[in-house]
Amino acid sequence: MAKVIGIDLGTTNSCVSVMDGKDAKVIENSEGARTTPSMVAFSDDGERLVGQPAKRQAVTNPTNTLFAVKRLIGRRYEDPTVEKDKGLVPFPIIKGDNGDAWVEAQGKGYSPAQISAMILQKMKETAEAYLGEKVEKAVITVPAYFNDAQRQATKDAGRIAGLEVLRIINEPTAAALAYGLDKTEGKTIAVYDLGGGTFDISVLEIGDGVFEVKSTNGDTFLGGEDFDMRLVEYLAAEFKKEQGIELKNDKLALQRLKEAAEKAKIELSSSQQTEINLPFITADASGPKHLTMKLTRAKFENLVDDLVQRTVAPCKAALKDAGVTAADIDEVVLVGGMSRMPKVQEVVKQLFGKEPHKGVNPDEVVAMGAAIQAGVLQGDVKDVLLLDVTPLSLGIETLGGVFTRLIDRNTTIPTKKSQVFSTADDNQQAVTIRVSQGEREMAQDNKLLGQFDLVGLPPSPRGVPQIEVTFDIDANGIVQVSAKDKGTGKEQQIRIQASGGLSDADIEKMVKDAEANAEADKNRRAVVEAKNQAESLIHSTEKSVKDYGDKVSADDRKAIEDAIAALKSSIETSEPNAEDIQAKTQTLMEVSMKLGQAIYESQQAEGGAEGGPSGHHDDGIVDADYEEVKDDNTKKSA
């Protein structure tokens, strides 16, 4: 039975895990790392880089290196948070055809779901390389505070990547699964998850295989990226004070600042002071300028104090919604890379009145929880019951633009709820059902998820028709809404798709693009491997011709030189073809066999002339040949 994998699709880093017996195992990627940067880059020659290779070239290619796109997923272009993000990233954020926020690289627009799909593809390939089999199904995590549009977009990303997403699971819930799988005694825990781009807090009751989420809260635009940018702004302001040059207008300098800020932030979690040193950051008429600055932990904490404090209100709201106090919490589990920051741990300790639990790896625990949930769905993990909640209230717009709730936040899912409404005018023959999600009293202040019309109502006085509106939320937190006229039996329903969102046709097109890209990546790799082998053979053959060319006939030597020239030409063409290179490599190997034979005979003759024991010289020849091949292989893999 094919394995179902668990993927933590993070803002900054992603991670993939699979059940190995009774334990969740985090899988290392092709670079040997357990987490993969959530970055995608497009080079000038059309190559697509994902993960660490994309991160390595970000400084030299800032406008085409896309990162933190999870913060844009499922968001409209006009969203104030998108507006804020535009000034902080070096790549263009554009308005998609459907009105959503998209990103642009090498002049082409991509939806955040498409970019996320490229990262998911990398995770899928990582798992396939480890398992030695195709992977087609996955459980993917999302921030608990993601709304319906963001969840749907994440599911779309999985589909584009060629994965059937069996379940969308909340990140804090996944972390609780990994933390509490072996715990038998009942506990009330809080999962404090401060990641690269989002913050979640969930209160759960766990024990004997039952994981019941009591409440969740958070901020989908608060995370490590904000801490980095706060430091970038400080460094740029200090540099401007000293040198009078605005670094934020220089995209290359901005990317270098961002990398330095992230590095300094990490170092300050374990040391009291760090030095930021960026030589040749910019230049003016007087010559090159360098940025050198010492930064203390206290200064950094002062810069980001308001960001850390922004996590407090959601924590208090979650405790209140769960009907517990901080004293009732038995354990606070820290999740997400930012939870390593001493200031964050200090605030958590003050808030909950106890030392937070640091026994889980904050970068890996979410993926492990996703793998456990995958195991539950597959039937490999027994006696685990997961009861999650919807993070935001759901309802419809009623007379006067009021938001009428049908399902309150923190309701256990899956769930279904109906309510009867009527018309506002006499002889009204159609009603528009506008579905929103949020906590504000007026519908316009909440997130509009979608709308649909129920038509063909018989003419009646206002207030007479009975229209039953039903909300149905599945285990992924994705909403379906139906409206039925009880008089005529007419019914209309929609599976809520973000008011922008991707249509099925969009997704199918992106699936085909993703498949074509995967094929192109495969071909590119085949070309690189063929070129490595060819260059290695050319090098060793040219060396042999130089040393022993006089041992073969002029015709044989010319055939070898022609084969070398043909192979070089095949490698150096603007669009190299792997099969062509392989065929010409084979030709060169065949024509150079006579040279090898001549070398062998020549060395045997020399051995005979010296009168030494031929067996001894044979060993030497074999060794020499072996060394040559080994040397070639070394060059091939370099």
Curated annotation (Swiss-Prot):
By its UniProt entry, which InterPro entries does this protein fall under?
ATPase_NBD (IPR043129), Chaperone_DnaK (IPR012725), Heat_shock_70_CS (IPR018181), HSP70_C_sf (IPR029048), HSP70_peptide-bd_sf (IPR029047), Hsp_70_fam (IPR013126)
Membrane-spanning segments: none
Keyword Nuclease assigned to the entry: answer is no
Which protein family is it in?
Belongs to the heat shock protein 70 family.
Q: Where is the composition biased (Acidic residues)?
A: 621-630
Q: What does this protein do?
A: Acts as a chaperone.
Q: State the protein's name.
A: Chaperone protein DnaK
Phosphothreonine, modified sites: 198
Q: What triggers expression?
A: By stress conditions e.g. heat shock.
Which keywords describe this protein according to UniProt?
Answer: ATP-binding, Chaperone, Nucleotide-binding, Phosphoprotein, Stress response
Tell me the gene name. dnaK
Q: What NCBIfam families does the database record attribute to this sequence?
A: PRK00290.1, PRK05183.1, prok_dnaK
In this chain, the stretch annotated as Disordered covers 599-638
Q: Does this entry carry the keyword ATP-binding?
A: yes
Q: Coiled-coil regions in this chain? A: none
Q: Name one Pfam family in it.
A: HSP70
Q: Name one GO molecular function term.
A: unfolded protein binding
Q: Which organism is it from?
A: Allorhizobium ampelinum (strain ATCC BAA-846 / DSM 112012 / S4) (Agrobacterium vitis (strain S4))
Q: Which SUPFAM superfamilies match?
A: Actin-like ATPase domain (SSF53067), Heat shock protein 70kD (HSP70), C-terminal subdomain (SSF100934), Heat shock protein 70kD (HSP70), peptide-binding domain (SSF100920)
